[in-house]
Curated annotation (Swiss-Prot):
GO molecular function: ATP binding; ATP-dependent protein folding chaperone; isomerase activity; unfolded protein binding
Subunit structure: Forms a cylinder of 14 subunits composed of two heptameric rings stacked back-to-back. Interacts with the co-chaperonin GroES.
Protein name per UniProt: Chaperonin GroEL
Keyword ATP-binding: yes
Uppermost EC category: isomerase
């Protein structure tokens, strides 16, 4: 395919049009008085959102050169979202400001490489100072404030804070769609895995269709059990103790399953069989997790252990087990605390080492089941359109809160970026590097300008006053008052602000040093020239 090439000024101008198209669509959502953007969907109702990265991903421009500019800024939003999970609109606003200012200077004759050096120098100083003014997050109230600011909803803030408090730092919090109108929190205590009973005849509560075992023994094996003789010796030992049995195996079927069911119905003893969770190597690891949690052993031929010679001391214990059609929950396993801690440390190390996002997610789930817990925020709304928008906001708020726990918080509402302005302005450089520093200085003001603009106010006046205020005092665009931002709970996670600034500067510097842009030449549509006249096809019948 033929290519089209544009050089220097012409190339950068075309890409800038794309940058502006995307950034102008995204930045209307910034701040407490930001608006929403409606995205058309090929199927179903349109999506209404104020999430920067969601909007950025939807934008495709007809002109190939403009589209490249738009995609560069979408990359800023996407990268910030990957690292910090929020702050995508701020990152987009910063990138647009740096690109615009930079382009003015490069057009006026500044050397892009010198400009880039100055920008990198200024951003490094800004980030260092952001870390200095950052405060660690303390207590449930602070967590609720961060989440409430991100989601623009206090109820969501307290839900997320409660979820984080109940499952701890190692816990997993997931967000699901609810069938009702209300948003609620559901916390699963203990270890839960997605395998239910092998037979509905094993239930102990026919109203709820669940089997509840109090103080059961737990037999854990990776073998398939079809013959009752294999587990008869250990069954007899359990019956003598008068306790129920949870049997976790690759599968339980045939005569073995029938015998367990018949004995349950007769009231001889109570046993529930479930399939082992996971597959392959992950199954072995999860069975080992259950064994550590319950203080039992995995009966596997890999370790030279045989079901027939299993002793009751090799079984796990728990205070309670609840088995439904789809899930098994083990509450208060009797495993030794130091062994559980060692297992948790081992899984944490694997989380750090893995490069696969899927593996990391699965390892964190295992970690949560052992050390924390699993919380599910069920999002409810009156319509599907509102539900999608609300779910996106809550996901952002959750990511924002995690980022705050990790690196602390700074004053929100664009205040922190202006707070570091004077420190960056004190940096001195020569020639084009100084121009680069000035570009970053102008960009630091842009988020607060945009927040003010979206609230119908004049940004320049607010920026000038903010530069002279003491650190931490900022402008609350929701009420129009000057307040101590952290005291009022108007905060941003340091990680979000830092990532937005770093990623914006990185892409802006790449943009300014671009000298040629290559794109596919659009094909000219020749109307009906695609197929030749097929009029003579009728004679093909004679080919038979």
């Amino acid at each position: 395919m033929a290519k089209e090439i544009k050089f220097s000024e012409e190339a950068r101008r075309a890409m800038l049009r794309g940058v502006d198209a995307l950034a102008d669509a995204v930045k209307v959502t910034l701040g407490p008085k930001g608006r929403n953007v409606v995205l058309e969907k090929k199927f179903g109702s349109p999506l209404i959102t104020n999430d920067g990265v969601t909007i950025a991903k939807e934008i495709e421009l007809e002109d190939a050169f403009e589209n490249m500019g738009a995609k560069l800024v979408a990359e800023v939003a996407s990268k910030t979202n990957d690292v910090a999970g929020d702050g995508t609109t701020t990152a987009t606003v910063l990138a647009q400001a740096m690109i615009r200012e930079g382009l003015k200077n490069v057009t006026a004759g500044a050397n892009p490489v010198g400009v880039r050096k100055g920008m990198e120098q200024a951003v490094a100083v800004a980030i260092e100072n952001l870390k200095e003014i950052s405060k660690p997050i303390e207590g449930k109230e602070s967590i609720a404030q961060v989440a409430a600011i991100s989601a623009a909803d206090e109820e969501v803030g307290s839900l997320i804070a409660e979820a984080m408090e109940r499952v701890g730092n190692d816990g997993v919090i997931t967000i699901e769609e609810s069938k009702g109108f209300t948003t609620e929190l559901e916390v699963v205590e203990g270890m839960q895995f997605d395998r239910g009973y092998a037979s509905p005849y094993m239930v102990t509560d026919s109203d709820k269709m669940e089997a509840v075992l109090d103080n059961p023994y737990i037999l854990i094996t990776d073998k398939k059990i079809t013959n009752i003789q294999e587990i008869l010796p250990v069954l007899e030992q359990v019956v003598q103790q008068g306790k129920p049995l949870l049997l976790i195996a690759e599968d339980v079927e045939g005569e073995a399953l029938a015998t367990l069911v018949v004995n349950k119905l007769r009231g001889t003893f109570n046993a529930v069989a479930v399939k082992a969770p996971g597959f392959g190597d992950r199954r072995k690891a999860m069975l080992e997790d259950i064994a550590v949690l319950t203080g039992g052993e995995v009966i596997t031929e890999d370790l030279g252990l045989d079901l027939k010679s299993t002793q009751i001391a090799q079984l796990g214990r728990a205070s309670k087990v609840v088995v439904t059609k789809e899930n098994t929950t083990i509450v208060e396993g009797a495993g030794e605390t130091d062994k559980i801690s060692a297992r948790v440390t081992q899984i944490r190390a694997q989380v750090e080492e893995t490069t696969s996002e899927f593996d990391r997610e699965k390892l964190q789930e295992r970690l949560a089941k052992l050390a924390g817990g699993v919380a599910v925020i069920k999002v409810g709304a009156a319509t599907e359109t509102e539900l999608k928008e609300r779910k996106l906001r809550i996901e952002d708020a959750l990511n924002s809160t995690r980022a705050a726990v990790e690196e602390g918080i700074v004053s929100g509402g664009g205040t922190a970026l202006v707070n570091v302005y004077n420190k960056v302005a004190a940096v001195e450089a020569e020639g084009d590097a100084q121009t680069g520093i000035n570009i970053v200085l102008r960009a630091l003001e842009e988020p607060i300008r945009q927040i003010a603009h979206n609230a119908g106010l004049e940004g320049s006046v607010i920026v000038e006053r903010l530069k002279n205020e003491e650190i931490g005092v900022g402008f609350n665009a929701a009420t129009g008052e000057w307040v101590n931002m952290i005291e009022k709970g108007i905060v941003d996670p340091t990680k979000v602000t830092r990532s937005a600034l770093q990623n914006a500067a990185s892409v802006a510097a790449m943009f300014l040093t671009t000298e040629a842009v290559v794109a596919d030449k659009p094909e000219e549509n020749g109307g009906g020239a695609g197929m030749p006249d097929m009029g003579g096809m009728g004679g093909m019948g004679g080919m038979m």
